[in-house]
Amino acid sequence: MMVRFDGVSFSYACAGAPALRDLSCSFAAGQVTWLFGKLGAGSSTLLLASGGFAPILTGGHRTGSVRIGELDPGDIANRAVLAGRIGYVSAQPHLQLSGLAETVFDEVAFAPANLGWDRERIDAAVMHALARVGAGHLVRRVPNELSGGELQRVVIAAMLVLAPEIWLLDEPASALDPATRAGAYALFREEARRGAAVVIATEDADGVLEVADRIIVLDRGQVALDGAPADVLASDACWALGVGSTTVGELWRAATERTPAMALGGVPLTLQAATAKVLRA
């Protein structure tokens, strides 16, 4: 399913400036879209509006059109139709716990049970989802006793079990170690291959660069740049916005201030690309 924004503005009740301003964009099925921007640029709000959580859960006021297919996710009348089709992972995963589950198994099974799945289907789907995020060994643990990284994997599994058509991910790997983080991004890439629209809001440029098809750079609630991640991140326009880049990209930019000749031929974003460029020099 495609998510479409057309001239959308959104303001929280107590905020002075709008979080989104006349924003238009779309997220396609089968594609990983990366939302990137400085703190307060609007990435988290864009995710919330995509799923209808803003304004239904957050309050505030939205103008313009948001559509998932032909449905407005911000219309509470459409919640039942969209239930199970949207997988949202918050930057604060502990807030997504049901508060009713005694074990990790029960937590991941919570949504399928509420959707009326039979027990056999639930059992198989829960164990498969936990295995895919490397959390099968946590199945009998108490959710509130998990570490940050363990909890993040369980929350991802709780969405994964539903095989959502749309993934809305807010810093979904922030608490994970490097190896597990790479596995999480690879999983989201697999979900896009399955046909899901995957939208990831993160500052983790090093991690998401390898899996993103597209990057949208936000600035003060508007789309500032939109294109292929390697092209956008290496551009002077992106650097001028002050949103940062990969670790290698930032180091290379800093080096060019001392040695301007290094800027010739573009900015490498990975260690492999930087090494190749140095060897060619």
What role is predicted for each listed range?
Residues W167-D170:
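Catalytic Walker B motif of ABC-type/P-loop ATPase nucleotide-binding domains
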